């Protein structure tokens, strides 16, 4: 007896589109290539009209009563659908949570670097998790860490809004910032 294969070598079953002879409904509501309704026609008559125009009969809506078909060039239609799907994939941006870590005794330049990193993350549409790390007895100074995080939120006010206020989580204090949908308009004191 031959050994059993570890995986299925058959080609995956692809669902074929409902066009031309694959449409099994006897009555169809037909729309021509210009968008003009031809009314409810039987399937054979609709196929005949499509072949006269050298186009395909494509099932658009199966759930309608009777099902809706359109007379169009299926190759061109498929290409347009793939192009739209590709554009949609390109435009969709997965929001990630980026982290900026620091200690509560951070120097000015290091703080400016963290602000720059957070700004870059927010401009690219990602959320920012600001973390202040405590070591040893530093946890007693959580009020200084909270002040630092609030200062950071204030400095990033134009690009972000506070999603979660500073709170202690284990040996860290964290705060979440999310990018602003609309730019903040500052009021002038005049």
From Swiss-Prot:
One of its GO terms (cellular component) is membrane. Pfam families: IF3_C (PF00707), IF3_N (PF05198). It is found in: Cytoplasm. GO terms for biological process: ribosome disassembly. Keywords: Cytoplasm, Initiation factor, Protein biosynthesis. InterPro entries: T_IF-3_C_sf, T_IF-3_N_sf, Translation_initiation_fac3_CS, Translation_initiation_fac_3, Translation_initiation_fac_3_C, Translation_initiation_fac_3_N. It comes from the Bacteria. GO terms for molecular function: ribosome binding; translation initiation factor activity. The keyword Ubl conjugation does not apply. PROSITE patterns: IF3. Monomer. Belongs to the IF-3 family. IF-3 binds to the 30S ribosomal subunit and shifts the equilibrium between 70S ribosomes and their 50S and 30S subunits in favor of the free subunits, thus enhancing the availability of 30S subunits on which protein synthesis initiation begins. This is Translation initiation factor IF-3. It comes from Prochlorococcus marinus (strain MIT 9301). The lineage of its organism: Bacteria, Bacillati, Cyanobacteriota, Cyanophyceae, Synechococcales.
